[in-house]
Amino acid sequence: MENTQENPATQSAEDIGSEKQAAQGAAPAAEAADAALAEAQAKVAELQESYLRAKAETENVRRRAQDDVSKAHKFAIEGFAEHLLPVLDSLEAAVNDTSGDITKVREGVELTLRQLTNALEKGRVVALNPVGEKFDPHQHQAISMVPAEQEPNTVVTVLQKGYTIADRVLRPALVTVAQPK
């Protein structure tokens, strides 16, 4: 009679041998997988660090920009104020003058007015004196209409000058306008 059944001891040894071979074959694959995993984890850590650096740099740029805007608002009038200081000096000198010479006072006031006008012009503040111009409701405020020889809707007199800054009206000129005939 033939024994078709294998020896359990032999079978176990064969199984153990094939398991060892499988384990030996799996060992390089596992090492390669572990190396790939370690490499991927290192890359993830590097990318996370780069992201955090970029995020911090972006925040620093935003903060610096806010500081620059804040300083610009805070000191925007500095140049204009520097141009006004000579006017202030002239007015203080006039107040302290005790000579009583009215001609001298008038000359001082005229000089101070020129200084102020120059300071305003340096600050891009320009006077509107529209006598003879067509009435413009964006730059002029009509106080009254008067009979005149000029064309209708033309500025006849300026009661108070208007002012613009960089083409924007600060104050409209108060004017009288020629009425239609």
Swiss-Prot record:
Localization per Swiss-Prot or TrEMBL: Cytoplasm
A GO MF label: adenyl-nucleotide exchange factor activity
Example GO BP: protein folding
SUPFAM superfamilies linked to this entry: Coiled-coil domain of nucleotide exchange factor GrpE (SSF58014), Head domain of nucleotide exchange factor GrpE (SSF51064)
Record keywords: Chaperone, Cytoplasm, Stress response
Compositionally biased spans, kind Low complexity: 21-39
A Pfam family hit: GrpE
Segments for region (Disordered): 1-39
Gene3D superfamilies per UniProt: 3.90.20.20, Head domain of nucleotide exchange factor GrpE (2.30.22.10)
GO annotations of cellular component type: cytosol
UniProt-listed CDD domains: GrpE
InterPro entries: GrpE, GrpE_coiled_coil, GrpE_head
Compositionally skewed regions (Polar residues) per UniProt: 1-13
Similarity section: Belongs to the GrpE family.
Subunit structure: Homodimer.
Cross-referenced HAMAP family: GrpE
Entry function: Participates actively in the response to hyperosmotic and heat shock by preventing the aggregation of stress-denatured proteins, in association with DnaK and GrpE. It is the nucleotide exchange factor for DnaK and may function as a thermosensor. Unfolded proteins bind initially to DnaJ; upon interaction with the DnaJ-bound protein, DnaK hydrolyzes its bound ATP, resulting in the formation of a stable complex. GrpE releases ADP from DnaK; ATP binding to DnaK triggers the release of the substrate protein, thus completing the reaction cycle.
NCBIfam families named among the record's database cross-references: PRK14139.1, PRK14140.1, PRK14150.1
Protein name: Protein GrpE
Annotated organism of origin: Burkholderia lata (strain ATCC 17760 / DSM 23089 / LMG 22485 / NCIMB 9086 / R18194 / 383)
Lineage: Bacteria, Pseudomonadati, Pseudomonadota, Betaproteobacteria, Burkholderiales
